[in-house]
Amino acid sequence: MRVSGSASSQDIISRINSKNINNNDSNEVKRIKDALCIESKERILYPQNLSRDNLKQMARYVNNTYVHYSGNCVLLSACLHYNIHHRQDILSSKNTASPTVGLDSAIVDKIIFGHELNQSYCLNSIDEVEKEILNRYDIKRESSFIISAENYIAPIIGECGHDFNAVVICEYDKKPYVQFIDSWKTSNILPSLQEIKKHFSSSREFYVRAYDEKHD
């Protein structure tokens, strides 16, 4: 875990290191901490209403890898979700050890957010994911989410899960819409709705989760 910055970074380290993780998961915790970077200088805050340019910049920041192929999409999406919540570039991820082996999202959640994030019921298409996100935005003004796709086929790795992000964008005088973000990618980080639907077939299973500070 690489750390730089002011005393505020020490607060994050203290919180991360104080999490009560099962001893059986110690190897997974080590992989996460070895890949996690904390950069908490007094950085400029992003605006409350994030733009596509803001999201692209934040997504590029969290991907701190040296080689593109790494099974760290769960950590990348958690880092981005954390940074979006705080409107700052704070966490990023390097390559994980055993790069073809993914990380357990429950353990990543506990380290980054302090608890496992509540997961939605199963959604069977990107259309359902979009509907769920907009519904939660309308009801509770939730605007940032982590999406887990099951049975995803990744290059080299084969069948696996894949985590990415979604944010509700509210542009002036326009209807709110969902922007998907895949910080694991090095190109097309902000795919359109049609591109993400083409990428994930309708037979996939999707789950939505989000950080709720009131949980703590």
Language model segments and positions:
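Large, modular interaction/toxin scaffolds in secreted and membrane-associated proteins
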Residues: 1-3, 186-187
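Conserved active-site-adjacent core of cysteine acyl-enzyme catalytic domains
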Residues: 83-161, 167-173, 178-183
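Active-site signature of cysteine proteases
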Residues: 159-216
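Active-site nucleophile-adjacent alpha helix/oxyanion-hole segment immediately C-terminal to the catalytic cysteine
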Residues: 2-116
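Surface-exposed beta-strand edges and flanking loops
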Residues: 5, 23, 34-36, 148-151, ...
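Short coil/turn linker and secondary-structure boundary residues
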Residues: 27, 50, 121-124, 191
